[in-house]
């Protein structure tokens, strides 16, 4: 079974491609996490977990969900992580997670996809994003070939910098940067509730037709990047930046 969590669609796209290539069922963790559903999941022997990279590891919300949820029938697990640039030493923590689940760790693969973390970085314009997705195809094909053969992924790079970013920096990043305080709606907001619908942690509610953010945020960027009116800002960090979600790339270029 292919499990995935996504913020703005990159991981969903990769997970769908992998599930199609392996003829495996696809399981949406966003829906489970949003519903607080930790009932056992009948996965079968092989599990492929596809996630974005948050602070140089898999998202904390995903590792927490896995810690509470039995993967019935699972014996082996592969991790596929998409990122804007690098995953650090995420593989070391994925190995630990597999051991905690008493699963055979089959490796971690990195696939570069368009950046979406506009709370800190710049997202690409649409044409550049399309180019990045095209450039990701060889890596995706390698991952598919290795999965079809039941092979372990080759170990990713691991140096002192990687260990530092995934190690000490990760909890500091969550503590000081992963907050919803800076999100706000502009006058362009039409109160459609798209942000409320997409938030995997139920951290957004509408008050007087405008979104209000709570304290439980994972910085997935779904609210700000999917807003149809681009009416959400993250303090001054997001002003003037392109909003990125994968589905926009699938629309006609003149749309």
Predicted regions, residues:
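FMN-binding flavodoxin-like domain, especially the glycine-rich phosphate-binding loop
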Residues: 1-2, 6-14, 20-32, 37, ...
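Short low-complexity, flexible loop/linker segments enriched in glycine and/or proline
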Residues: 41-42, 121-123, 220-222, 248-252
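Long, positively charged, glycine-interspersed low-complexity recognition regions
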Residues: 230-255
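Iron-sulfur cluster-binding cysteine motifs and their immediate structural context
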Residues: 184-185, 190-212, 216-218, 222-239
């Amino acid at each position: 079974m292919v499990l995935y969590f996504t913020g703005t669609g990159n991981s969903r796209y990769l997970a769908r491609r992998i599930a199609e290539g392996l003829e495996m069922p696809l399981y949406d963790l966003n829906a489970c996490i949003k519903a607080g559903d930790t009932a056992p999941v009948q996965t079968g022997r092989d599990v492929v977990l596809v996630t974005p990279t948050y602070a140089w590891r898999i998202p904390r919300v995903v590792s927490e969900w896995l810690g509470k949820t039995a993967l019935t029938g699972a014996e082996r697990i592969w991790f596929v992580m998409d990122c804007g640039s690098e995953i650090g030493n995420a593989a070391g923590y994925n190995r630990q997670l597999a051991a905690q689940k008493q699963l055979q760790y089959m490796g971690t693969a990195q696939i570069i996809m368009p950046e979406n973390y506009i709370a800190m970085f710049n997202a690409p314009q649409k044409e550049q994003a399309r180019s990045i997705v095209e450039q990701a195809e060889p890596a995706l094909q390698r991952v598919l070939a290795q999965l079809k053969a039941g092979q372990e992924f080759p170990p990713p790079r691991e140096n002192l910098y990687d260990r530092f970013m995934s190690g000490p920096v990760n909890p500091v990043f969550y503590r000081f940067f992963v907050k919803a305080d800076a999100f706000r709606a502009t006058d362009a907001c039409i109160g459609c509730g798209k942000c409320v619908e997409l938030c995997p942690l139920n951290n957004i509610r509408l008050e007087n037709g405008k979104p209000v953010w709570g304290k439980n945020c994972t910085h997935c960027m779904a609210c700000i990047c999917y807003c149809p009116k681009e009416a959400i800002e993250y303090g001054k960090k997001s002003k003037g930046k392109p909003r990125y979600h994968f589905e926009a790339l699938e629309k006609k270029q003149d749309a």
